[in-house]
């Protein structure tokens, strides 16, 4: 998903780039992120622009991920590059087994695990959740969202106001 891109993604992509002359990144859709995480933090075009502007990324491809896999994207890559190139589907520290990976069935693709490191060093979800769960600091004090009723457009906030201060 690369939503948002973090140090673990960078390590994965740099290590994957060392395996080949070209790095093609398959970028999941906003719909996939909504199914997996509730909603995207950054939309597809924002994520694509970030990735396309990394010196080690040669191409960013969209694909049909409605089956929650990258099979369609890998099939696109095979059509673009086979038979002249060795093709790798690289997985970082959070995927390390053929048992739970539908992409293993794509002909012409070699699977690589632990690329960029054998352990997961960061998480997009963790970064986003930590950012939004911190109290917002202001000159007058701070506030925190205790409950978000997004469907109603309502947030319940706690305000802590410093003595002698008032909100703006």
PLM-predicted stretches and their roles:
Residues 129-166:
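A short, N-terminal "cap"/entry segment at the start of jelly-roll beta-barrel domains
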Residues 22, 166-168:
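Conserved active-site beta-strand-loop modules that form the wall/rim of enzyme catalytic pockets
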Residues 1-137:
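Nucleotidyltransferase catalytic core that binds NTPs
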